[in-house]
Amino acid sequence: MQVRLMPLPADQWDDEVRGAFKGMLPRDRQNPEGAGTALSTLVRHPDLTKAFLGFNVYLLFRSSLPPRLREVAILRVAHRRHCGYEWEHHVELAEAEGLTGADVEAIRRGAANNEVDQVVLRAVDELDEISTLSDETWAALGEELSDRQRMDLVFTVGAYAMLAMAFNTFGVQLEQEKGK
């Protein structure tokens, strides 16, 4: 993948850049190494970064969607959008939420080891393909999730699809690939 936007160099991190992370990243991570390649790239546009991170922090930490299902959805988005950065980072988060290696591989294939995960995978695929959910999928989600949780699912899928587009377009590399 071609890197189109490099992470912002350390000597260009000013108060505006650090302000984009205020309240969203611990102080010790408000630097190029601590923020990682994705955030260090996004912060080339501090206003956009601050606006997006506020929404993203909600999706990751305050959403009504159960964290395990959130990670099932994000991994499916990352796979469908061919976003290696998103995939690698969220495999770690998924494992922390109890998904196994077999679960992760099943998500990649569009299969699941239980009915709830399978409905979430179907929802991600439908949202990605036709930008809506079929009545059948909406109803199936409703058997397990509240209206708020279904709303959070739709916004999670949309936000991570957009983030995958940005990472892929900008050429954001995994931290271990930086400099290769």
Could you tell me what each predicted segment is?
Residues 1-65, 170-180:
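Acidic, glycine/proline-rich low-complexity segments that act as flexible tails and inter-domain linkers
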Residues 97-123:
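A contiguous pocket-lining binding segment that forms or flanks enzyme active sites
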